[in-house]
């Protein structure tokens, strides 16, 4: 699989990444929110041992041994969740070298296994998750009920325990406010759309996460195919909206795109929300072939690297808010200059 952030493949039109997440629990332990720190760390050791023969592939990060800032950088890279950080005294995660796989331990469930790849490639992500899940299940007993399927802390994950999602760029549907209808429609068919950091996260930069909401009574194939059908419809709506807006407001759109690029290339201070909004207009310009000398790879990298914790890690310094804005503007200018 290809890491969506750093891939040089330029085929990720509208859909930036695809993710498959499996929720699993061990049969001989209670759920993470009820276990002690000692029990939680025992679970971490138990899962580590299963993958010890795969040491060349995976690295273990124990949150209680990590600097708080480093924890947040992995959140900003979509490798862990805010819930795992809250469980930092007994939480850990395992990832591979190219960071396309992340196995969270003691988040809401004992295991939250996720595989992320670039573009609209849900089947590829599922194959990756399935292979690692099979390896773990060969060595550990999962909590499983013949009628309900995989047992999970939250009832919405019962059954396959599978959550399929895509990160999708919908600037035009946001501009014409059609996105509100999509929000409403998805809820009615058991899907959800939210910010890119999942439940409770704010939508910024016109980037959304679309995923299934229920798993009970559905096979893995049905969950994936249902989501694919919905995402194809959203993609078509976004493309039609782009065609329409270019016919009616061509110069206004071009002005927004080039104005955004101009600000990014010259700003002295940039806050993260403004930066993501401007990057969205530039991405739209690239996707619509208005801008030809900026790569999607650079835009993807900037989407992550301009985040508050990432900026501080890149410059290896604890920064004030104004200092972060200054370094963010500096980083953006440098990356765009080298983008051609």
UniProtKB/Swiss-Prot annotation:
Catalytically driven reaction(s): L-arginyl-[protein] + ATP = N(omega)-phospho-L-arginyl-[protein] + ADP + H(+)
Q: Which UniProt keywords apply?
A: ATP-binding, Kinase, Nucleotide-binding, Transferase
Please explain the role this protein plays, according to its UniProt record. Catalyzes the specific phosphorylation of arginine residues in proteins.
Q: Which CDD domains does the annotation name?
A: bacterial_phosphagen_kinase
Supply one GO molecular-function term.
Answer: protein kinase activity
So what EC number does this one have?
A: 2.7.14.1
The gene for this chain is: mcsB
Instruction: State a GO cellular component annotated for this protein.
Output: extracellular space
Pfam families from the UniProt entry: ATP-gua_Ptrans
Q: Which residues cross the membrane?
A: none
Keyword Iron-sulfur carried by entry: no
UniProt: ATP binding residues: 17-21, 112, 163-167, 194-199
The highest taxon in the source lineage is Bacteria
UniProt protein name: Protein-arginine kinase
> Phosphagen kinase C-terminal domain spans which residues?
14-241
